[in-house]
Amino acid sequence: NWLKYTSTNRVKNVDRGGMDFIMYPGVITSDKHDYYKNIYDKGHLAPAATFSDSMDNLGETFYYLNCALQNQDLNRGEWRMLEAEERKWDDSETLTVLVDLIFDEGYIVLKTGAAVPSDMIKHIYFEGRGIWKCFEFENIKPTTGWEEHEVIHSH
C-alpha cells in the first residue's frame, strides 16, 4: 500500500476548515467508523496543507484513499513536523514523495476489520539535487524527533 505525490511551492489560497474525509465511489477503504473512540487519526498520506492552493486540490486530499489509521501522537507530532519541513524544502526544489504503509506480521486489525499499518515510510526525492531522504516511523507515539527517523534506502 503506497501513495505518491509531487510537492511544489504552491501558494496557500484556501483553508481546510469544516472538511472531512469522504469515500471514493466503488473503492473499499477505511471509513469514519474505523476512527471512532480510539487512538488513531485519519492521517493524511498526501498532506492537505501541501495542496491548499485550490479547493479542487485540497478536496482531493480528503478521500479515505488518502489516509491511514495513524497513531494520533505520530500524526499530530513528528509526522506533521516532517510535512512542514517538506513545505520548506519545496520552496527551492520540487519533491516527489512516496509514502509506503507497512503491515508487519501481527499488525493490528480493529473490531471494524480495518488494518492498522505497523510502520510508515516516507521516501522524498529532491528533483533538483537528485538525492533521496527517507524517514521510517513505527505507528506508535514517537519518543524521538522526526530527524532521528531518517534511514538509508537504496533507490
Segment roles from a protein language model:
Residues M23-H155:
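Domain-level detector of nuclease and nuclease-like folds
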Residues N1-S30:
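Glycine/proline-rich, flexible active-site/cofactor-binding loop segments
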